[in-house]
């Protein structure tokens, strides 16, 4: 098992795994065309890695990506975790915690003061994970579904 920075070659070599992970993430939270959304996110991942605006770390087992965390700098003080996923077969082994520590380490090295993320209020395992890693609830997102007549 290896935790390391992800580069463009890793994204290309692990395209199938990444798209499967994105499908798991997206299908839980949206009703949009999942395949198109996965392609869009995967393409952005490659662009943001190429222009160094993404911070991505991955967990690898024999060169196969088994999870990743993708963050970016909002401003010099605040970093946002955009996507975070560990393959179901590898959960509860400390991989997520190690990936999170890598993001924290990199943010501290750049003098960042805060890491933020969104988590759905019914994703209890994620909420528990973040609380265990010293994250605290800081806001509540409100939304209204509009009816189209």
Where are these regions (language model features)?
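Loop/helix-junction capping segments adjacent to catalytic residues or to phosphate/diphosphate-binding pockets
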Residues: 12, 93, 124
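A generic structural signal for beta-strand entry/edge sites
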Residues: 76-78, 114, 139
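Conserved acetyl-CoA-binding loop-helix of GNAT-fold acetyltransferases
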Residues: 86, 92-105, 128, 132
């Amino acid at each position: 098992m290896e935790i390391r920075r992800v580069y463009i070659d890793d994204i290309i070599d692990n395209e199938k795994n990444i798209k499967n992970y994105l499908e798991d993430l997206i299908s839980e939270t949206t009703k949009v065309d999942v395949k198109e959304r996965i392609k869009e996110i995967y393409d952005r991942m490659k662009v943001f890695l190429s222009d160094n605006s993404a911070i991505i770390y991955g967990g690898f087992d024999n060169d196969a990506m088994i999870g990743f965390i993708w963050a970016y700098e909002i401003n010099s003080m605040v970093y946002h975790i955009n996507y975070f996923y560990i393959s179901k077969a590898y959960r509860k082994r400390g991989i997520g915690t190690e990936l999170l520590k890598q993001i924290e380490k990199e943010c501290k090295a750049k003098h960042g003061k805060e890491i933020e993320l969104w988590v759905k209020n019914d994703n209890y395992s994620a909420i528990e994970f973040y609380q265990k890693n010293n994250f605290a609830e800081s806001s509540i997102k409100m939304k209204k579904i509009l009816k189209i007549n």
